């Protein structure tokens, strides 16, 4: 995961200091990209320990089309707690947009199912896109989508994915985003009979919060270790039929966790 370490270093060395919505302040850069060949291992940051359960359960929650934290809480995941209202609702966030994008005539578009069908029937398409950025709904979301658009591509029997992330909390959020979309690519590949190819992570505003700088410096003193491998239940292929227990990561031997506050 030298790519991730290089992004941390780039921000610390070249980042511009700015105020932000949270009041904490950031230093950041604009327009960066990382690439991960999924045949080389599961891209899970090793210079600090990540909570794998949160990554997997959140992705399954997105794919359910869910926007209430009850499912997350039932599965021991608390990463969305700060943004939920008293009923656990988050408004029309990722799951709603992925699975039930509202149309002007009162119907809904299941973008994930549409892309699945299109990959199977028209793999050369350049329209294999899912967007979570819905201007009509943004003001009703507890947190507008940071990872807001992704595109699939089929080449030589391999499924590739590129994510555009408009806003990237590089210390806390990005390690989760890398692993989440890498796993989504693998799940989509399984569902469409393809091999996982490359995950490309493209950033708009990539930043470190000012209260994460010491943690980032500490992380840069650590040498990345070998990537783990992720095993998926060989009996499963339905994209919407997975459960947390269907996944197992082997060979994950990271450096210790680094604690840092969340900017809300």
UniProtKB/Swiss-Prot annotation:
<comment type="similarity">
    <text>Belongs to the thymidylate synthase family. Bacterial-type ThyA subfamily.</text>
</comment>
<feature type="binding site">
    <location>
        <position position="169"/>
    </location>
    <ligand>
        <name>(6R)-5,10-methylene-5,6,7,8-tetrahydrofolate</name>
    </ligand>
</feature>
<dbReference type="GO" id="GO:0004799">
    <property type="term" value="F:thymidylate synthase activity"/>
</dbReference>
<dbReference type="GO" id="GO:0006235">
    <property type="term" value="P:dTTP biosynthetic process"/>
</dbReference>
<dbReference type="InterPro" id="IPR000398">
    <property type="entry name" value="Thymidylate_synthase"/>
</dbReference>
<comment type="function">
    <text>Catalyzes the reductive methylation of 2'-deoxyuridine-5'-monophosphate (dUMP) to 2'-deoxythymidine-5'-monophosphate (dTMP) while utilizing 5,10-methylenetetrahydrofolate (mTHF) as the methyl donor and reductant in the reaction, yielding dihydrofolate (DHF) as a by-product. This enzymatic reaction provides an intracellular de novo source of dTMP, an essential precursor for DNA biosynthesis.</text>
</comment>
<feature type="binding site" description="in other chain">
    <location>
        <begin position="207"/>
        <end position="209"/>
    </location>
    <ligand>
        <name>dUMP</name>
    </ligand>
</feature>
<dbReference type="GO" id="GO:0005829">
    <property type="term" value="C:cytosol"/>
</dbReference>
<feature type="binding site">
    <location>
        <position position="263"/>
    </location>
    <ligand>
        <name>(6R)-5,10-methylene-5,6,7,8-tetrahydrofolate</name>
    </ligand>
</feature>
<keyword id="KW-0963">Cytoplasm</keyword>
<dbReference type="InterPro" id="IPR036926">
    <property type="entry name" value="Thymidate_synth/dCMP_Mease_sf"/>
</dbReference>
<keyword id="KW-0545">Nucleotide biosynthesis</keyword>
<dbReference type="GO" id="GO:0006231">
    <property type="term" value="P:dTMP biosynthetic process"/>
</dbReference>
<keyword id="KW-0808">Transferase</keyword>
<feature type="binding site" description="in other chain">
    <location>
        <position position="21"/>
    </location>
    <ligand>
        <name>dUMP</name>
    </ligand>
</feature>
<dbReference type="InterPro" id="IPR023451">
    <property type="entry name" value="Thymidate_synth/dCMP_Mease_dom"/>
</dbReference>
<dbReference type="InterPro" id="IPR045097">
    <property type="entry name" value="Thymidate_synth/dCMP_Mease"/>
</dbReference>
<feature type="active site" description="Nucleophile">
    <location>
        <position position="146"/>
    </location>
</feature>
<comment type="pathway">
    <text>Pyrimidine metabolism; dTTP biosynthesis.</text>
</comment>
<feature type="binding site">
    <location>
        <begin position="126"/>
        <end position="127"/>
    </location>
    <ligand>
        <name>dUMP</name>
    </ligand>
</feature>
<feature type="binding site">
    <location>
        <position position="51"/>
    </location>
    <ligand>
        <name>(6R)-5,10-methylene-5,6,7,8-tetrahydrofolate</name>
    </ligand>
</feature>
<keyword id="KW-0489">Methyltransferase</keyword>
<dbReference type="GO" id="GO:0032259">
    <property type="term" value="P:methylation"/>
</dbReference>
<dbReference type="InterPro" id="IPR020940">
    <property type="entry name" value="Thymidylate_synthase_AS"/>
</dbReference>
<feature type="binding site" description="in other chain">
    <location>
        <position position="177"/>
    </location>
    <ligand>
        <name>dUMP</name>
    </ligand>
</feature>
<dbReference type="Pfam" id="PF00303">
    <property type="entry name" value="Thymidylat_synt"/>
</dbReference>
<comment type="subunit">
    <text>Homodimer.</text>
</comment>
<feature type="binding site" description="in other chain">
    <location>
        <begin position="166"/>
        <end position="169"/>
    </location>
    <ligand>
        <name>dUMP</name>
    </ligand>
</feature>
<protein>
    <recommendedName>
        <fullName>Thymidylate synthase</fullName>
        <ecNumber>2.1.1.45</ecNumber>
    </recommendedName>
</protein>
């Amino acid at each position: 995961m030298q790519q991730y370490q290089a992004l941390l270093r780039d921000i610390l060395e070249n980042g511009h200091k700015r105020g932000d919505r949270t009041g904490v302040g950031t230093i950041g850069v604009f327009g960066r990209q990382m690439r991960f060949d999924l045949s080389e291992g599961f891209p899970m940051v090793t210079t600090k320990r990540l909570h794998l359960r949160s990554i997997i359960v959140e992705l399954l929650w997105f794919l359910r089309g869910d926007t209430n934290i009850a499912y997350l809480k039932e599965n021991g995941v608390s990463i969305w707690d700060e943004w939920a209202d008293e009923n656990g609702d988050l408004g029309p966030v990722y799951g709603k947009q992925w699975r039930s994008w509202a149309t002007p005539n009162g119907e809904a578009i299941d973008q994930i199912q549409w892309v699945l069908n299109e990959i199977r029937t028209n793999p050369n398409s350049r329209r294999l896109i899912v967007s979570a950025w819905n201007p009509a709904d943004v003001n009703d979301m507890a947190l507008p989508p940071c990872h807001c658009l992704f595109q699939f591509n089929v080449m030589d029997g391999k499924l590739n994915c590129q994510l555009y992330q408009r806003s990237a909390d590089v210390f806390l959020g990005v390690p989760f985003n890398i692993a989440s979309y890498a796993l989504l690519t693998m799940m989509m590949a399984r569902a469409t009979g393809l091999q996982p190819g490359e995950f490309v992570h493209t950033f708009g505003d990539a930043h470190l919060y000012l209260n994460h700088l010491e943690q980032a410096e500490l992380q840069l003193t650590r040498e990345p270790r070998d990537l783990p491998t992720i095993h998926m239940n060989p009996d499963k292929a339905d994209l919407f039929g997975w459960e947390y227990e269907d996944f197992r990561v082997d060979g994950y031997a990271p450096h210790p966790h680094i604690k840092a506050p969340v900017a809300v």
